UniProtKB/Swiss-Prot annotation:
Its EC number is 3.1.3.16, 3.1.3.48. It comes from Homo sapiens (Human). GO terms for molecular function: MAP kinase phosphatase activity; p53 binding; phosphoprotein phosphatase activity; protein serine/threonine phosphatase activity; protein tyrosine phosphatase activity; protein tyrosine/serine/threonine phosphatase activity; RNA polymerase II-specific DNA-binding transcription factor binding. Brain. In the brain it is expressed ubiquitously except in the hippocampus. Expressed in embryonal cancers (retinoblastoma, neuroepithilioma and neuroblastoma) and in anaplatic thyroid cancer. This is Dual specificity protein phosphatase 26. It is found in: Cytoplasm; Nucleus; Golgi apparatus.
Length: 211
């Protein structure tokens, strides 16, 4: 199991931090199913965090959050036997570095690899990778029998952010809809910087539809 206790502790800490912040969060009510969908219009970061704290918080080493699309952690990425069992054909590593992740790691499995060298920091610009990552995921799922693992160290922030961007770019989901779709299957908690970047993408896509 991936560290579900860690995820819950992180969510609890962030919730307390939000409440104690000098900038008061906007209060929302209701369950995950009652949260707004298309007509949000544009939630702020605190409202998104409230949505993230609601509903499923547990996770496995990998969870199928969209048909053929698995969101997971480094342990799953290193488990060749499990990758073969799941039929994974592509791996997108959102925590790529000289020490973590290479195409050679999947030699003999027929897996195509894309590494994104991203830092799980609110100051890191993940948005520059949104389109490239979404295109890679789309190509993987477009081929017959294609299945992709999108992962980072824990599978809740960097990789989750790229999966949300993919759902928004290729399936025209709003950010709220994308979060709800993923959280039906796995707890996630992108950092605040990533949430702001996803909000900017959401605004751009919504404004493009309205133009």
């Amino acid at each position: 199991m991936c560290p579900g206790n860690w995820l819950w502790a992180s969510m609890t800490f962030m919730a307390r931090f939000s409440r104690s912040s000098s900038r008061s969060p906007v209060r929302t009510r209701g369950t995950l199913e009652e949260m707004p969908t298309v007509q949000h219009p544009f939630l702020n970061v605190f409202e998104l965090e409230r949505l993230l704290y609601t509903g499923k918080t547990a996770c496995n080493h990998a969870d199928e959050v969209w048909p053929g699309l698995y969101l997971g952690d480094q342990d799953m990425a290193n488990n060749r036997r499990e990758l073969r069992r799941l039929g994974i054909t592509h791996v997108l590593n959102a925590s790529h570095s000289r020490w973590r992740g290479t195409p050679e790691a999947y030699e003999g499995l027929g897996i195509r690899y894309l590494g994104v060298e991203a830092h799980d920091s609110p100051a890191f610009d993940m948005s520059i990778h949104f389109q490239t990552a979404a295109d890679f995921i789309h190509r993987a799922l477009s081929q017959p029998g294609g299945k992709i693992l999108v992962h980072c160290a824990v599978g809740v922030s960097r990789s989750a952010t790229l999966v949300l961007a993919y759902l928004m770019l290729y399936h025209h989901l709003t950010l709220v809809e994308a979060i709800k779709k993923v959280k039906d299957h796995r707890g996630i908690i992108p950092n605040r910087g990533f949430l702001r970047q996803l909000l900017a993408l959401d605004r751009r896509l919504r404004q493009g539809l309205e133009a």
